Amino acid sequence: RGCAVFAPQQETAAADTETLDREHAAAALEWAPTLLVDDGAHLIRLAHTEHQSVLSVNGGELRAASEETTSGVRPLEEMAALGALQLPVLAANDARTKRDFDNLIGTGQSCVFAIADLLDRDEAAAAGITAGVHGKRWVVLGYGPVGFGVARFASAFGARITVVERDAVRALAAMHDGHEAASLELALPDADVVVSATGVWHTLNAEALRLLRPSAVVAVAGGIDDEVGLDELLALGWEATGIAEHLDRWCPADSSRDEGFLLLAGGGGVNYTAAEGNPIEAMDLSFATQLVALDRLVGQELAPGLHRLRVADEDRVARAALAAFGGSADPRAESGRPGGAAQDWRVHRYRA
């Protein structure tokens, strides 16, 4: 049947992008797919709002989906909790073969490389930025897999890391990993580089952005729309001045032009907006995870709701990757006992 592609056939004006995206998303659903592989759950949510007729429960063809990202799984969890999710959706993002490689290693590496490259330009130097990562104070917001990866790679290049994390256990983990852990109010004023790795709307709102010193650099790792609250700054009269491609200075209207902070990639995910994206070795694992998710959706009827991949699904992807990379897993079988204990539970040190 060939492959239907819902995208412009030629270069388009930036002003037309949002309109075209909406039209193509609607066209993709009206094409009547039976399965979706989504990124951000935007198509899934569109099918549950403006295009409910495409859902199988309403007589349409769409009967299941798989979701790639943390930012997509979160709204799906809310939909499931409210009883609004009318499809079975597999959270490919939560599989170890996706989260522990694409999120942690791939995004961590690509974001740090992207930030370092963007700041190693003559325009950045003219704006008061010293190139390099070594010795700089990096503040990483969020210590999930992406934040952990960003902190690890930046630290490997010699950055001093402060982690801002609301979860006390994760904040403690950051300290045990050799970083500092502090509140937003304490961390931001001393930051050279601030990386938001939360995937949460308005993680850096206007109040937080006012804490930044002049020429502090702000970037988003991975990310969602409006993770940096630029809409709040515009409402307060702040202005953006372009310094170079993917580098803008944001200042209050009544300030001098060198007082504001520097924003990378317009507040979008810096690794895929202004750089090369994640390494293919990590992305291969994500795509393979999506493939086994589709295979399961084709072969098994699941109830509407959010589902996780099975350990066997993860193992299938991992073994294929090991073979491709020239490695292997230990072939010895586990005990087969529930819990995996090597001996019968009746065997203990105090037995008579």
Please provide the spans of the model-predicted regions.
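Glycine/serine-rich phosphate-binding loop and adjoining beta1-alpha1 elements at the start
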Residues: 2-134
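A short helix->loop->beta-strand "cap" motif at the edges of active sites that frequently abuts
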Residues: 3, 60, 85-87, 158-159, ...
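ADP-ribose/adenylate-binding Rossmann-like module
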Residues: 35-39, 52-71, 200, 209-251, ...
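Adenosine-phosphate binding glycine-rich loop
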Residues: 88-127, 230-339, 344
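NAD(P)-binding Rossmann-fold cofactor-contacting core
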Residues: 92, 155-177
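Hydrophobic Val/Ile/Leu positions in short beta-strands of Rossmann-like dinucleotide-binding domains
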Residues: 138-141
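Hydrophobic/small residue at the entry helix of a nucleotide-binding pocket
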Residues: 146
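Short acidic low-complexity segments
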Residues: 178-191
